[in-house]
Amino acid sequence: MKIWYILGILLASAFLSSAQENNSGKVIYEQVVKLEIKLEGDAAQYADMLPKERKTNKVLYFNPEESLYENGKSEAPDPMQMQHGGSNVMIRMEEPDNKVYTALNDTKQIEQREFMSRVFLIERKTENQWKLTGKQKMILDYPCQEAEMEKDSSRITAWFTPVIQSQAGPGSYNGLPGLILAIDTDNGKNTITAQSVDFSELPKDALQKPDKGKKVTQEEFDAIVAEKMKEMGVENGGKTGGTHMMIQIKR
């Protein structure tokens, strides 16, 4: 009996030590966004040339108190050039320099958003009302649990692992009892999936708060985007997952 008791203490100590070591690090994610772009007027004839999805790499730096989510290293795709109806068409996609900083203890977020060469800072409190479903699966050999919520008319599904004791997650998603390794919005319209987890010591400047840009509320930023998209003849803000898409036509 004494031997089993000692063994139990050693196993518990090992698990606690591992959990403590696994609360700080870096996660590389792949984001896949299904592109929904509606063009009006003369531009509508080029709709069938546009890509149907966009893949990018993202990185999350985290520790028990804070996290920073930003662009990872992705090769910029070459512009698509083609001819259509006697016109030369070039389509170029650019990834804006967006970042999301989260203070995990009070769920305060500072988001840096780049739009049409302008940079904005949006401060807010996160209100993620998660509900656990009881479903489980493995991601990168980590046991994960499923949680869901409704937010901004979208259904969000998250997979988090209690093995990594951080409430951080990609983008604005956080607040679960473990690191979020995957997000699915509206059955695959926007997915974010962890590709690797690294517990190496973070650089000292890895968790710097964004401080460049014009301070606006979320409502003000949404209005700016909607107005500009309306001027350009793009409906619904041109849902490209934050990617800037430019179409140049030469006749």
Name each model-derived stretch.
Residues 20-251:
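Extended soluble regions of mature proteins
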Residues 15-19:
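Sec/Tat signal peptide C-region and signal peptidase I cleavage site
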Residues 4-13:
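Sec-dependent N-terminal signal peptides
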